Structure formats: C-alpha cells, structure tokens
Amino acid sequence: MANSITLTVGETTALKTFKDHIAYAGMPSENVYSIVQMKNVRAKDALAWNLFFPKSKTEIVIDKVNILVENVTTDVIRLRMGMWQ
C-alpha cells in the first residue's frame, strides 16, 4: 500500500493512470461521504459522477483500485491506495 493521501473538499488525485482521477466531494449527511470519479479529465469527452459510501465503509474499490479510507470528516478525507485485479 502507498503512503497516505489527504484530500480536502474539491481536491483531486490520480488513480492508476493519469486519465482517471478522484476528488473528495464531502459528506452530504453525517453518515455518508462522497467521492467523485472522473474519466479522461483532460479530454473533450471527460466524464464525472459521484459515488456515495456509508461512513462505516473503510475499504472501497474504484476502477479496480483498492482504497483504504483511514479517516473521513466533512472537510477532509485521508486515503491509502493500492492496485490489484
């Protein structure tokens, strides 16, 4: 697993390729957090959508990338990312 990555609301980081990114979108309720998945961010045909997770869910997979959510608050999320298939 990689080092921790800390994102505030609106900040992005790359997933396994630089075409795919995620951004922290905050917490729409006290028990739910949201991550935006973005595809082809530099292209004209870029796509993005929100993913919603219960705050209790600490292990998630986005685009075949394992993500461990170490801490999540309304303003900040701390993650560790690793890849496997």
How would you label these PLM feature ranges?
Residues 1-85:
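Surface-exposed, beta-sheet-biased, low-hydrophobicity segments with strongly acidic/polar composition
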